[in-house]
Amino acid sequence: MTQKNGPLRVGIGGPVGSGKTTLTEKLCKAMRDKYSVAVITNDIYTQEDALILARRQALSEDRIIGVETGGCPHTAIREDASINLQAVVEMTRRFPDLDVVFIESGGDNLAATFSPDLADLTLYVISVCQGEEIPRKGGPGITRSDFLVINKSDLAPYVHVDLEVMEADAMRMRAKRPFGFTDLHRGKGVQEIIDFIVENGGLEPRSN
């Protein structure tokens, strides 16, 4: 079902190496049979993430647009999101029945946020490999994203991270905003994120 005001736009942010592209891939593969899905990726000088998603066959290539932001990638999702908004318009032109567009930011820091004009829902991805203290460092991505993804939970024993500490810190920093632990490589935790997107984005599976 196409949204009344256009497709649902889901922003996916997080530091380099946290698992943004893997999350985007898993979401596309899990949702593409029930919804009309597209992706817009952001890289500074290349379209590498778009190429990765195409190689992994997350979606057909015509459903993936790679945006080269140049300079600071934060600007393209926040202060001046016009290049991404244009990509959304182009994707909607290609697929008038589009239900959801995932907009993956370039690698960013804890201060990066999506403009509300660009994203209806925001997911922020961090990795346990960044350290146990990451949730309590705060920043808009940690405290204000609609759903915080704490990825690579399977590696916690190897990087000496206590997941219970991370959980307690995330609960304290985010108040009642949801978060979840994932092992995206194995697909663990993906369904919880999908359920969140469907419920909070008002998506309804298209009838066959």
Curated annotation (Swiss-Prot):
Residues bound to GTP: G14, P15, V16, G17, S18, G19, K20, T21
GO molecular function terms noted in the UniProt entry: GTP binding; GTPase activity; nickel cation binding
Compartments, record wording: Cytoplasm
Keywords assigned: Chaperone, Cytoplasm, GTP-binding, Nickel insertion, Nucleotide-binding, Virulence
Disulfide bonds: none
GO biological process: urea catabolic process
GO cellular component, one term: cytoplasm
Signal peptide: none
Nucleotide-binding as UniProt keyword: yes
Pfam family, one: cobW
PANTHER family (alphabetical): UREASE ACCESSORY PROTEIN G
Subunit record text: Homodimer. UreD, UreF and UreG form a complex that acts as a GTP-hydrolysis-dependent molecular chaperone, activating the urease apoprotein by helping to assemble the nickel containing metallocenter of UreC. The UreE protein probably delivers the nickel.
Protein name (record): Urease accessory protein UreG 1
Organism expressing this protein natively: Brucella abortus (strain 2308)
